[in-house]
Amino acid sequence: LKSSLGSKYVLTAKWEKHTFSKGWRYGEGEALAVVKPGTLFEIWTVLNLCVEEDVIVIMQAANTGLTGGSTPFGNDYDRPIVIINTMRVNDIHIINEGKQIIGLAGSTLFGLENELDKYGREPHSVIGSSCIGASIVGGVCNNSGGALVKRGPAYTELSLYAKINLDGKLELVNDIAVSYTH
């Protein structure tokens, strides 16, 4: 991992990992390492290494801990855990006159609010979690109901993601059909 990202972005000391292995609100556990890739290609590289080594991967953006999904929960896992913190991969691409966006894994609701302001628009989710730096993905996942139903749906129409196929190999799925280079 260190040879791929550099030691600055691979945290292995307990004190370095603490902020990333404990949610602000909920969840805490041990991780072998916390890695902080800066590009989609670096995320892909890290994922491939983790799949090859058969470690558990927890993808993490803002780590608000609102639902406990971004950190280990306890210490009784059957394999080591690597947390991939995506906050350095935070580009937001505005498309269709501000009606749609492509938000990379670490992009935040606060950043989106700033970008959409140029179009006289605001994000679907502008309550609570926005002020603690929640990611766009987290905002869509956690804030698409309740009081926000009146604003209409917040959802992911198309996505770029990785999955492990039936042969145990990492596979890139690009529903967006936008070409990314590193």
Model segments located where?
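Extended, alpha-helix-rich binding/interface surfaces that flank or overlap catalytic cores
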Residues: G106
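Conserved small/polar residues in nucleotide/adenosyl-binding loops
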Residues: T181-H182
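Short beta-strand segments
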Residues: Q60-A61, N85, V137
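Structural detector of well-ordered beta-strand residues that form the stable sheet scaffold
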Residues: I58, I102, H124-V126
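N-terminal flexible segment immediately upstream of the FAD-binding catalytic core
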Residues: L1-N48, G65-Q100, G128, N142
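A gly/ser-rich beta-alpha-beta helix-loop segment of oxidoreductase catalytic cores
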Residues: L66-T67, T71-D76, F110, L116-I176
